[in-house]
Amino acid sequence: MSKVKFAIPKGSLEEATFKLLENSWTKVSRKSRTYRVFLDDPEIMVKMLRPQEIPNLVADGLYDVGITGKDWINETKSDVDPLLDLEYGKIKLVIAIPDTFKFKNFDDMIAEYAKKKKILRLSSEYLTNASKFIKNCKSYKKVFGNKDPMIITPWLRVGNNKNVQIHLSFGATEAKPPEDVDAIMDVTETGTTLKQNGLKIIDTVMK
């Protein structure tokens, strides 16, 4: 009988995941600076991975089960079956802008930038969700129709609307406005980090 392959998240969900395992049926151990986790059940192989990667790895059959966030299941559109809400790491996906900006929502922001013929730049790790959200904004549909916002990464540019751009973030997204981008789409639990970086939430994309 082959081992059960179990992927667990590294990063913001890591500590809570280890507490969950330690309070369950098994002892947990690992060596520092390694991604291998050992349970006292020899039938389970555990590896720590980035939560962004886990949905697709489970969908492709490389792992039998994994722990990740709903945000990454939604973003990757992976063909997986959510089994249980573990009820930790409660976050929401939001749009935030500098607190000096007067826009009430992102729809108003799109309309104003289009009126002034300014390029609107948004930074996010969530490229799929960002593009979908923007295309569903009334002002975007009115001005740009069915055009796709331009998604910009270090290795790729896709989309046919350079007037609204989504820039891939590799983290510390809240640090990018206002010099590098005009807005961000990011996850937050309490909003404290956003406020500390002079940002305010104007839209909630997903809870």
Label every PLM stretch briefly.
Residues M1-K207:
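Domain-level signature for soluble enzymes in the chorismate/prephenate branch of the shikimate pathway
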